UniProtKB/Swiss-Prot annotation:
Organism whose genome encodes this protein: Carboxydothermus hydrogenoformans (strain ATCC BAA-161 / DSM 6008 / Z-2901)
PANTHER family: 23S RRNA METHYLTRANSFERASE, RADICAL SAM CORE DOMAIN-CONTAINING PROTEIN
Taxonomic classification: Bacteria, Bacillati, Bacillota, Clostridia, Thermoanaerobacterales
UniProt catalytic activity: adenosine(2503) in 23S rRNA + 2 reduced [2Fe-2S]-[ferredoxin] + 2 S-adenosyl-L-methionine = 2-methyladenosine(2503) in 23S rRNA + 5'-deoxyadenosine + L-methionine + 2 oxidized [2Fe-2S]-[ferredoxin] + S-adenosyl-L-homocysteine; adenosine(37) in tRNA + 2 reduced [2Fe-2S]-[ferredoxin] + 2 S-adenosyl-L-methionine = 2-methyladenosine(37) in tRNA + 5'-deoxyadenosine + L-methionine + 2 oxidized [2Fe-2S]-[ferredoxin] + S-adenosyl-L-homocysteine
GO biological processes: rRNA base methylation; tRNA methylation
Family from the record: Belongs to the radical SAM superfamily. RlmN family.
Annotated protein name in UniProt: Probable dual-specificity RNA methyltransferase RlmN
Alphabetized GO MF terms: 4 iron, 4 sulfur cluster binding; metal ion binding; rRNA (adenine(2503)-C2-)-methyltransferase activity; rRNA binding; tRNA (adenine(37)-C2)-methyltransferase activity; tRNA binding
GO cellular component, one term: cytoplasm
Alphabetized NCBIfam families for the sequence: rRNA_mod_RlmN
Gene: rlmN
Residues engaged in binding S-adenosyl-L-methionine: G158, E159, S190, S213, L214, H215, N289
PROSITE patterns the UniProt entry points to: RADICAL_SAM
Amino acid sequence: MRAFLDLNSEEIVAWLKENNEKSFRLKQINEWIFKHGELDFNKMTNLPVRLREKLKENFLLPSLKIIHSKKSRDGQSIKYLLKLKDNLGIEAVLLKYRYGNTVCLSTQVGCKMGCKFCATGLGGFSRNLTAGEMIEQILVLKASSSEKITRVVLMGSGEPLDNFTEVLKFMRKINEKDCLNISYRKITVSTCGMVPQIKALAEEKLPVTLAISLHAPDDALRNELIPINKRWGLAELLDAAWYFIDKTGRRVSFEYALIENVNDTVEHALKLAQLLQRKLVHVNLIPYNTIEKRNFKTPSVEKINKFKEVLKRAGIPVTVRRELGDEIDGACGQLKAKYFEV
């Protein structure tokens, strides 16, 4: 039996027609699910009883369950530990900013990439999430918090472009007017550097934001921190980024976690500036969040500001990311499913 949210609109309309039902029923079903948060076909009372019975016989509705949630002291972030139908665990985070509410979602259970400073890969990789399971995360966080979701970032556990087909399907579906109606411009896709998939995403010409986890300004250091760099080095990665800009007209965001005595010197900043000058980019500096089992530390505020100033003087737009959720293991690099460790 298929999960209803795994199907795109064309697939559902085709199923309705095969079962002698009118295609407008899809809009009614979507209204129940996405507007009212109703996840029981029986309670969709403007559908004929016969259709409700057919839906129950053929499709599963969301089964994602909240196992645990933890709110930050300032109330601006909530981390959720969620259990999938096969009892595997994933994490999602609700982040409240002045401009609206952002959800940080997982795209895989675990991760294959093995980045040396990240917590997610410590537990290994289990499987990809389906498009429906990504949508479920939004529905669960929305229902639990009673907050309107305005932005989506795919920066939870997993490498989004390693699950390219399902991520693409997910983005298309949440963009639909009768579903969540989230603008592509309010979706951020993160990657540690899967070059062919960056180019494939560019070919789709969706005006999403691409966020590249760079974290080093040269191949020698990046090879140490991000193993996938040994397959596609900086030159290839940057070529793919410029290709994405050319195809979409969208600025690329480069994420750079500042780690004490690893990648945080003025020399590193100068190298980074040289790589990115005169390009349509933005640099997000992320003060490293200390992680248990990772022997890295956060630089001083003085070093962070010096690094930032070098980039600013080079004319590169740069911000120091305001981290919400670090105290609840919910910030970048800290999405750990401690609850599920046995």
